[in-house]
Amino acid sequence: MFVDLVIRQLVHEPVMMLDLCAAPGGKSTALRAALPEGSLLFSNEPMRTRSQILAENIQKFGHPDMIVTNNYPRDYKKSKLQFDVILTDVPCSGEGMFRKDDGAIEEWSLQNVDNCWHLQREIVSDIWNCLKPGGILIYSTCTFN
């Protein structure tokens, strides 16, 4: 995974981090392993059913400095929480699936691309004020169209 390498390069002191769209938990466990001891990682998944899977996987990982949450980005906007690092692995329009799944081509539309673009902007806008001054925002998506 690439994001844990980024964390190891940039983060050398304990931090408070938010993995905003974390299910099923692979990124969060890799991130937590890469963070300095004393760091606290919030692993969040807005979709309830996916957050339950996330919670199970985080529990199996067994690191005590991880908190699983089930919030939408706008909920964090309302909070007073401030994070040193935020990872936003935002929803995408799915072009990367074309080579693996014939059905993905049939489901693709310009409207879906536009919807994803608006949702991505909304997510970043909602969590921006939760990033401490000088903090790190890691923006990730699998398709840029």
Place the predicted regions along the sequence by residue.
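S-adenosylmethionine
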Residues: 1-145
